[in-house]
């Protein structure tokens, strides 16, 4: 039976109604500080915890509930005669219901002007201690951390005078999940005051919050969900607002993220089309409409069923053209009212608005799940520091611009990756081959464009001269690659024979 409850919350949502109902069930209410004040002002009979402990709140409220009279009442096992005799001897009354939520540490550290001192003052000590005590003793004690659970608990107490064991177990689990996240956020925040570096730490604790359940995963037989990091979501899908269309799927989110990662490489008006996380059309232009037209023309076949991301507002002209194609998702910093009107006819097309699409921060690290653990690495944020011309012929300024453009793209192509570019427009892309020459040959074979006068980017070095010979045969005038092969000299010689310029970056960009 629930006879005594302790209520102490930072989030006051629903607490008055909860206390009113508990009082109507003749349950004694203990409370502290602001919660007790609010309940009294609402006409509810409340007993201060300091009355129970015989010790006043002190140190500006830092010490309120850390006392055996509180924790003994929570932790005592009710059918353990020794425990109950001890409570009687010490004049401690059992506490059957604990309702706590914690100081708003997460909300505090998300403020742009937060200080370390302010963050530290919002680290709750007594709250987690009581929560964990009640959760540990959930066989006898009900614990609530989430106001959404108030109604469920009240209904069970009203019906049975107590909660069900299964309910108490679920609520206890919720507490341990929450306090684990709470401590992880504190550790992460304090760690960042010393260094942003996670890699190299002996232990890593990662915490995420659910955004939504997904209908299924990569395939219909796989369960899936979408979770977000705490903070650091500027310019990401989590930061976006869906304006139109069906709910995003697992594959939509994965592909859209790939499009965003690539789009963030560019500041000038650019459109990116992605299919199965690989770019299939990328172009920049003097304005976003030109960029869209060029990106679509890059590969009108592969864009079917793809994801499109633009770094400027989508216009009516773009919308009219996009409407004629089957697209899964369109992402942009904005959509004109006229564009939204055009898209109304496409009920399933998902439109996502991400205002900070250009300025959002890249992740500082990447995680890959492997059997038995994770791989953790820095984000691949370096393109190159300088271009080292290694051939007799030097690329023109226009070719250098195209080379840099192509290298930004190939960095986001599954390895082995090859990209052909001309006038800041992809003409052919060869992704995900086990042989570099196959990637190059597939790109040449599958394009509908002439590659004459184009430039070529490779995500890693050429092991043999066959790539240079094939590129020359396709009409390539300049090549950008990391270099670093023991056969670099052979590739350089081939370029010189064909009159092709080639630059080395010194940075490889494998993507798996």
From Swiss-Prot:
Give the species this sequence originates from: Alkaliphilus oremlandii (strain OhILAs) (Clostridium oremlandii (strain OhILAs))
Where in the sequence is the signal peptide annotated?
none
What reactions does this protein catalyze? Answer: (6R)-10-formyltetrahydrofolate + 5-amino-1-(5-phospho-beta-D-ribosyl)imidazole-4-carboxamide = 5-formamido-1-(5-phospho-D-ribosyl)imidazole-4-carboxamide + (6S)-5,6,7,8-tetrahydrofolate; IMP + H2O = 5-formamido-1-(5-phospho-D-ribosyl)imidazole-4-carboxamide
Tell me which PANTHER family the record gives.
BIFUNCTIONAL PURINE BIOSYNTHESIS PROTEIN ATIC (PTHR11692:SF0), BIFUNCTIONAL PURINE BIOSYNTHESIS PROTEIN PURH (PTHR11692)
Name its GO BP terms in alphabetical order.
'de novo' IMP biosynthetic process
Q: What are the disulphide bonds in this sequence?
A: none
**Keyword rRNA processing tagged:** no
Superkingdom, according to UniProt? Bacteria
Q: Which NCBIfam families match?
A: PRK00881.1, purH
Q: Which UniProt keywords apply?
A: Hydrolase, Multifunctional enzyme, Purine biosynthesis, Transferase
The molecule here is called Bifunctional purine biosynthesis protein PurH
Occurrences of domain MGS-like (ranges): 1-145
């Amino acid at each position: 039976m629930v006879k005594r409850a302790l209520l102490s919350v930072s989030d006051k949502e629903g607490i008055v109604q909860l206390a009113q109902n508990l009082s109507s069930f003749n349950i004694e209410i203990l409370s502290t500080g602001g919660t007790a004040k609010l309940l009294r002002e609402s006409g509810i009979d409340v007993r201060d915890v300091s009355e129970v402990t015989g010790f006043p709140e002190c140190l500006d409220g830092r010490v309120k509930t850390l006392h055996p009279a509180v924790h003994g009442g929570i932790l005592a096992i009710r059918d353990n005669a020794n425990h109950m005799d001890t409570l009687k001897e010490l004049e401690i009354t059992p506490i059957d219901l604990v309702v706590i939520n914690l100081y708003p540490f997460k909300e505090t550290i998300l403020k742009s002007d937060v200080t370390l001192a302010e963050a530290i003052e919002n680290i709750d000590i007594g709250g987690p201690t009581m929560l964990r005590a009640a959760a540990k003793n959930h066989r006898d004690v009900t614990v609530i951390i989430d106001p959404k659970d108030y109604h469920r608990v009240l209904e069970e107490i009203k019906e049975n005078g107590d909660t069900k064991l299964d309910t108490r177990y679920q609520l206890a689990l919720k507490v341990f999940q929450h306090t684990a996240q709470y401590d992880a956020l504190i550790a992460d925040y304090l760690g960042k005051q010393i260094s942003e570096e996670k890699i190299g730490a002996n232990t890593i604790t990662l915490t995420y919050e659910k955004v939504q359940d997904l209908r299924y995963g990569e395939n219909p037989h796989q369960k899936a969900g979408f979770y977000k990091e705490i903070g650091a979501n500027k310019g990401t899908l989590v930061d976006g607002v869906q304006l139109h269309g069906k709910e995003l799927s697992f594959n939509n989110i994965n592909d859209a993220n790939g499009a965003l990662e690539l789009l963030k490489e560019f500041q000038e008006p650019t459109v990116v089309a992605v299919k199965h996380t690989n770019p299939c059309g990328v172009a920049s232009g003097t304005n976003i409409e030109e960029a869209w037209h060029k990106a679509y023309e890059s590969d009108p076949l592969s864009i079917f069923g793809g994801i499109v991301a633009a770094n400027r507002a989508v216009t009516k002209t773009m919308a009219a053209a996009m409407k004629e194609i089957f697209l899964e998702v369109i992402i942009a910093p904005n959509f004109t009212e006229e564009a939204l009107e055009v898209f109304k006819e496409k009920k399933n097309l998902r439109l996502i608005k991400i205002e900070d699409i250009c300025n959002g921060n890249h992740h500082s690290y990447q995680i890959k799940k492997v059997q038995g653990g994770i791989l953790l690495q820095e984000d691949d944020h370096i393109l190159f520091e300088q271009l080292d011309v290694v051939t007799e012929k030097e690329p023109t300024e226009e070719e250098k611009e195209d080379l840099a453009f192509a290298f930004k793209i190939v960095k986001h192509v599954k390895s082995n990756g090859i990209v052909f570019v001309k006038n800041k427009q992809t003409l052919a892309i060869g992704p995900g081959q086990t042989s570099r020459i196959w990637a190059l040959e597939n790109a040449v074979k599958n394009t509908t464009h002439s590659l004459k006068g184009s430039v070529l980017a490779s995500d890693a070095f050429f092991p043999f001269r066959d790539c240079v010979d094939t590129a020359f045969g396709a009409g390539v005038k300049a090549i950008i690659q990391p270099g670093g092969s023991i056969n670099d000299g052979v590739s350089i010689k081939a370029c010189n024979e064909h009159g092709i310029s080639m630059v080395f970056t010194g940075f490889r960009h494998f993507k798996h």
